[in-house]
Amino acid sequence: MSQEDKQRITVEIYNRKYHIVGEESERHMQLVADLVDQKMNEIHEVNKQLDTSSLAVLTAVNTMNDYLKLKEDYATLLGSIKKKED
């Protein structure tokens, strides 16, 4: 996809505006931004003393943890399906 074909939107995450460019739909990119904002606010509620940088890192760590769990679950499901097909 060429640079001209990419979607460009402005989103707000943790009370800051960001310009995002991507190949996904505007709706998808807005959903991603909304979920990041939600996760940052959830973590902030538990750890109000964190600065924005630390909060962003904890959000990334939590998100990657969730991603890896889902990836492992997906691999397990694929393995179960393959066994049933054999």
Curated annotation (Swiss-Prot):
How does this polypeptide assemble, per the annotation? Homodimer. Interacts with FtsZ.
Q: What is its main location?
A: cytoplasm
**What family does the entry list?**
Belongs to the ZapA family. Type 2 subfamily.
Instruction: Kindly list the places in or outside the cell where this protein is found, as annotated in its UniProt entry.
Output: Cytoplasm
| Gene Ontology biological-process entries | division septum assembly; FtsZ-dependent cytokinesis; septin ring assembly
Q: Name one GO cellular component term.
A: cell division site
List, alphabetically, the NCBIfam families matched.
PRK14126.1
Domain of life, per UniProt, equals Bacteria
Q: What does this protein do?
A: Activator of cell division through the inhibition of FtsZ GTPase activity, therefore promoting FtsZ assembly into bundles of protofilaments necessary for the formation of the division Z ring. It is recruited early at mid-cell but it is not essential for cell division.
Query: Which cysteines share a disulfide bond?
Result: none
Name the keywords, alphabetized: Cell cycle, Cell division, Cytoplasm, Septation
| InterPro entries, sorted | Bac_CellDiv_Activator (IPR053712), Cell_div_ZapA-like (IPR007838), Cell_div_ZapA-like_sf (IPR036192), Cell_div_ZapA_firmicutes (IPR023688)
Q: Give the protein name, as stated in the record.
A: Cell division protein ZapA
